[in-house]
Amino acid sequence: MDIIKQIEQKQMRDDIPDFKTGDSVRVYVKVVEGQRERQQPFEGIVIRKKGSGLRETFTVRRTSFGVGVERTFPVHSPKLGKIEVLRRGKTRRAKLYYLRDLKGKAARVKGIR
């Protein structure tokens, strides 16, 4: 068991900021188009964090042109450029699935003062 932890430790990233559900984040994803590689930002609210260690993932939700879009990212993926925490949110739940049913201003999360 200890060997697995040692191998995973080498692959884990150490530049991940501390964030939790309810926070507004901007995730930069590395996209390859032909010979070029660029970083595509995806901005939204973290509605879920799942797993631990190398298998940890988080889901970000945003509304684009009236349609809800969710993307799930592995935290330690080499495809992620960087993660910026834009705003801290105050929530009482670990999973914010109820935001899927809300529209407009009701789908916002209160910020920490």
UniProtKB/Swiss-Prot annotation:
> Which first-to-last residue range defines the signal peptide?
none
Query: Which biological process terms from the Gene Ontology are attached to this UniProt entry?
Result: translation
Q: Which Gene3D superfamilies match?
A: 2.30.30.790
> Keyword Amino-acid biosynthesis: yes or no?
no
Q: Please provide the record's keywords in A-Z order.
A: Ribonucleoprotein, Ribosomal protein
Instruction: Tell me where on the tree of life, at the top rank, the source sits.
Output: Bacteria
Q: In its keyword annotation, does this UniProt entry include Cell membrane?
A: no
Q: What is an example of a GO molecular function annotated in this UniProt entry?
A: structural constituent of ribosome
Among the entry's GO cellular component annotations, what is one?
Answer: cytosolic large ribosomal subunit
Question: What's this protein's family per the entry?
Answer: Belongs to the bacterial ribosomal protein bL19 family.
Q: Which HAMAP family match?
A: Ribosomal_bL19
Give the protein name, as stated in the record.
Large ribosomal subunit protein bL19
Give the encoding gene's name.
rplS
